[in-house]
């Protein structure tokens, strides 16, 4: 008897060792694949081409970009530009209307905005806004945007973004609540480390994507068949139908990396843990598995075999499953499953009733369970290729009593965490303020969608897995007063219900002639969109006289009182100043309501910022001409008591070869008896901001706000930075990447500003006079207008030019008094012969001719 037991034990040990060797060989093969992948990834161009060939998915792009960023540490200017270029390339090839519901695509957009914030914070706001519009259902997109605004000192804007995220139903809600709480506590980080850990699990599970990407991870994502199978099983487990593309399993993926280290690293502002991270499984306690098992027990729907396998693996990880026995058979009936089999889980018992006397599983049973799992996995992988999309119909359930005395708890605290990512709501624009309708899957009760879960009954418990209604945050469509009012198309969309938020927001470069804007009864046809920023958009339009104008549209529904006041100031300043100078952009018409503002303005060819980016080298005469235009425009606003305080290249536009000033959004009007004004907050662009606008000059606080002084000399500093950019190709402090270090360098007198030698000595002198930190010692606009650099320098040939001009006047004077063609021809021949012989002008004859003209 003992001999038989020894023989049986030896056979079991041999079997275990054999399986361990197989696993070891499998790991070695995967490591070899990873090394090959690393060699391939050394050539980024080849990697990008490979991504395009295998499907061009956001998951592959994010996997590549994270690895590229990890290898780019520490970050410098060249690497930063390279990263921004790669992220921009990814966004260009990934259409937002197709991947707007994809988490990996959202993280790519957010990370690009964060990198732009490092390089140029002014441009970063547009990228954050783009990410918010394209991927509004993800909470981390809104939190990242709010964190950026908070870092720029825009507390109200940050709070407004978080409130709007809650209204639109962004998930997970817990992340937004945490960010809102920290914002009210005046913390610098909206998601501290301890809060990031608490929301990481819910963030990953709410996505329910096979390639759950993390903003806080810089490791490669596993996109193997195993991960796709488990993620698909999780979605079936919670009542979601598998799309056909997820039911199919790729036989080979060149980006497979199944054994890479999974750890949470600070990447961006909202790091979370992956679903396949070891830390996640460590945190999976028995209570979560208990509730999951209880839910399976109450289900009357036949679930595929892969769902049962996933549940069995969860039990094994929690240490709750036995190697064999009736309880295990209740969980996974049958010993030889097939890929097409499904099982009734009606008789599954809650986990509390399973025999759990021992907290730890014995070594023999653990090895047996592991061998069964390996066998089941191999069969499941083969069966997944035949798996088809199932459409389970949930029968009406009557309330059931829990078999345990313990009150049921929701596995996840956020009721919106299980919103299926692949469900896109159908939003139809309406003129009223009602929320748009949403198409709900058959297994959902539309009336109970988005309700708060309760533990009173099973129905209340299941409500935590309902799909939340996404609220429309776009302006109501009005056929007579919206830039997106395509009258015929809009009526058709309202009838068919095919409009989406993205479709109602985006305007193509070559738009239809049906797109029009009505301003004070005048109709303007939209040609294209030429700019956007924040809540405003600029369109190139054609007026009724077939003249090209620009219309600036501002959405006021989400704007606070300070923003609305800034736009009203802009209109008032334009009306006031355009009468005194042609260097100010012209305002032809405007319309103001509580919902929007329309401004019909002069249309420029290109703004100065875009022009500088396109020009490799600037002609000295162009630079001098544009510099004089800027001085004249700023001099006019200073004469009318206005300090712009946010001058930058984007505030100037080129119109028919002349530079004109635009955008007075944050300008302030000074009183006649003052030389400076006190602002309630720091505004302006860091690269062009004067030191006195950064430093607390007043040493006083009002309503807990730091007040700073700005004066006309502050605009001189900004103009000097623009001229520095036009001369050297960068701003004086652009090479300093860290924003805090940049601010210190601007206000620190010990930090010397570099002025490399150039051929134009007067230009270098102007730069030195403008970039003086002490505003009292800084040059003024009138002094700059009289500076030798602005004046046209006389050339040696100027006297010769004046002589040629006099000769031309003489010739024209001889011809202008003649009437008959014969006289004109005779005089012309005489003049030609005289100049051809070198005789030149006869002054006496010229004077005589002038006297004859006077007598006539």
From Swiss-Prot:
Phosphoserine carried by residues: 36, 277, 342, 383, 435, 454, 820
Tissue: Present in rapidly proliferating cell lines; high levels in testis, bone marrow, spleen and thymus. Low levels in brain, heart, lung and kidney.
Disordered as annotated region, ranges: 837-856
Activity regulation field: Inhibited by the ATP-competitive kinase inhibitor, SP600125.
Entry EC number(s): 2.7.12.1
N-acetylmethionine: modified positions: 1
Residues with Phosphothreonine modification: 32, 380
InterPro entries attached to this UniProt entry: Kinase-like_dom_sf (IPR011009), Mps1_cat (IPR027084), Prot_kinase_dom (IPR000719), Ser/Thr_kinase_AS (IPR008271), TPR-like_helical_dom_sf (IPR011990)
Protein's UniProt keywords contain Methyltransferase: no
Keyword set, alphabetical order: Acetylation, ATP-binding, Kinase, Nucleotide-binding, Phosphoprotein, Serine/threonine-protein kinase, Transferase, Tyrosine-protein kinase
Any GO CC annotation of this UniProt entry: membrane
Reaction equations catalysed: L-seryl-[protein] + ATP = O-phospho-L-seryl-[protein] + ADP + H(+); L-threonyl-[protein] + ATP = O-phospho-L-threonyl-[protein] + ADP + H(+); L-tyrosyl-[protein] + ATP = O-phospho-L-tyrosyl-[protein] + ADP + H(+)
One of the record's GO molecular function terms: identical protein binding
PANTHER family: DUAL SPECIFICITY PROTEIN KINASE TTK, MIXED LINEAGE PROTEIN KINASE
Similarity-based family: Belongs to the protein kinase superfamily. Ser/Thr protein kinase family.
Descriptive protein name: Dual specificity protein kinase TTK
């Amino acid at each position: 008897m003992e001999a038989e037991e020894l023989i049986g034990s030896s056979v079991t040990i041999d079997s275990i060792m054999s399986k361990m060797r197989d696993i070891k060989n499998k790991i070695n093969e995967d490591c070899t694949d990873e090394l090959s992948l690393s060699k391939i990834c050394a050539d980024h161009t080849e990697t990008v081409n490979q991504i395009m060939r295998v499907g061009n998915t956001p998951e592959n792009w994010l996997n590549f970009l994270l690895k590229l960023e990890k290898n780019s540490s520490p970050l410098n200017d060249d690497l930063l530009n390279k990263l921004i270029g790669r992220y921009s390339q990814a966004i260009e090839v990934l259409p937002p209307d197709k991947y707007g519901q994809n988490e990996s695509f959202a993280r790519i957009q957010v990370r690009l905005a964060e990198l732009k914030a490092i390089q140029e914070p002014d441009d970063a706001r547009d990228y954050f806004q783009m990410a918010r519009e394209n991927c509004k259902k993800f909470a981390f997109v809104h939190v990242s945007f709010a964190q950026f605004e908070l870092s720029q000192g825009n507390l109200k804007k940050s709070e407004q973004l978080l409130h709007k995220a809650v209204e639109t139903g962004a998930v997970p809600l817990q992340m937004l609540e945490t960010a809102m709480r920290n914002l009210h506590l005046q913390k610098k980080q909206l998601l501290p480390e301890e809060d990031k850990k608490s929301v990481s699990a819910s963030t990953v599970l709410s996505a329910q994507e096979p390639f759950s990407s993390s903003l806080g991870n810089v490791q490669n994502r596993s996109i193997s068949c195993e991960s796709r199978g488990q993620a698909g099983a999780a979605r079936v487990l919670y009542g979601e139908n598998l799309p056909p593309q997820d039911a199919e399993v790729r036989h080979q993926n060149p980006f497979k990396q199944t054994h890479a280290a999974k750890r949470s690293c600070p990447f961006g502002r909202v790091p979370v843990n992956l679903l396949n991270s070891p830390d996640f499984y460590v945190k999976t306690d028995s209570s979560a598995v208990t509730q999951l098992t209880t839910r399976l027990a109450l289900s009357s729907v036949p679930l595929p075999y892969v769902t049962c396998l996933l549940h069995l693996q969860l039990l094994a990880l929690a240490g709750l499953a036995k190697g064999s026995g009736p309880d295990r058979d209740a969980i996974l009936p049958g010993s030889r499953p097939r890929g097409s089999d499904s099982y009734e889980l009606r008789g599954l018992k809650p986990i509390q009733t399973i025999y759990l006397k021992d907290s730890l599983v014995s070594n023999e049973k653990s090895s047996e369970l592991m061998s069964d799992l390996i066998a089941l996995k191999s069969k499941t992988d083969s069966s997944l290729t035949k798996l088809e999309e199932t459409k389970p119909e949930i029968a009406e359930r009557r309330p059931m009593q829990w078999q345990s005395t313990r009150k049921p708890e929701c596995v996840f605290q956020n009721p919106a965490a299980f919103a299926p990512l692949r469900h896109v709501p159908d939003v139809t624009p309406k003129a009223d303020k009602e929320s748009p309708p949403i198409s709900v899957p058959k297994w959902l009760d539309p009336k109970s969608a988005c309700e708060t879960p309760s533990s009173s009954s099973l129905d209340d418990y299941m409500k935590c897995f309902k799909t939340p209604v996404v609220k429309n945050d776009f302006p109501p469509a009005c056929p007579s007063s919206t830039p997106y009012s395509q009258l015929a198309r809009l009526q058709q969309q309202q009838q068919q219900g095919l409009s989406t938020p993205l479709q109602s927001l985006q305007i193509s470069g070559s738009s239809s002639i049906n797109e029009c804007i009505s301003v004070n009864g005048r109709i303007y046809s939209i040609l294209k969109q030429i700019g956007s920023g924040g809540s405003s958009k600029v369109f190139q339009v054609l007026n009724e006289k077939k003249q090209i104008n620009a219309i600036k549209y501002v959405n006021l529904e989400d704007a606070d009182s300070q923003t609305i006041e800034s736009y009203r100031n802009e209109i008032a300043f334009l009306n006031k100043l355009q009468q005194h100078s042609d260097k100010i952009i012209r305002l032809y018409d405007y319309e103001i309501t509580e919902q929007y503002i329309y401004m019909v303005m002069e249309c420029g060819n290109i703004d100065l910022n875009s022009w500088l980016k396109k020009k490799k080298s600037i002609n000295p005469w162009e630079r001098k001409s544009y510099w004089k235009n800027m001085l004249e425009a700023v001099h006019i606003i200073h004469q009318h008591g206005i300090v712009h305080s946010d001058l930058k290249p984007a505030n100037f536009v080129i119109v028919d070869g002349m530079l004109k000033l635009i955008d007075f959004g944050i300008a302030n009007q000074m009183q006649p008896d003052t030389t400076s004004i006190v602002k309630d907050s720091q505004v302006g662009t860091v690269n062009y901001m004067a030191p006195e606008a950064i430093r607390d000059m007043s040493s006083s606080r009002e309503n807990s706000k730091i007040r700073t002084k700005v004066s006309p000399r502050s605009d001189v500093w900004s103009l000097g930075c623009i001229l520095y950019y036009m001369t050297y190709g960068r701003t004086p402090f652009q090479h300093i990447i860290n924003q805090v270090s940049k601010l210190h360098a601007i206000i620190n007198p010990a930090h010397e500003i570099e002025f490399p030698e150039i051929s134009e000595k007067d230009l270098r002198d102007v730069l030195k006079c403008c970039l003086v930190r002490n505003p009292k010692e800084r040059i003024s606009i009138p002094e700059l207008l009289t500076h030798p650099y602005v004046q046209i320098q006389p050339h040696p040939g100027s006297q010769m030019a004046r002589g040629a001009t006099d000769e031309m006047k003489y010739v024209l004077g001889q011809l202008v008094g003649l009437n008959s063609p014969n006289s004109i021809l005779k005089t012309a021949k005489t003049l030609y012969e005289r100049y051809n012989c070198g005789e030149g002008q006869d002054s006496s004859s010229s004077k005589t001719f002038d006297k004859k003209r006077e007598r006539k």
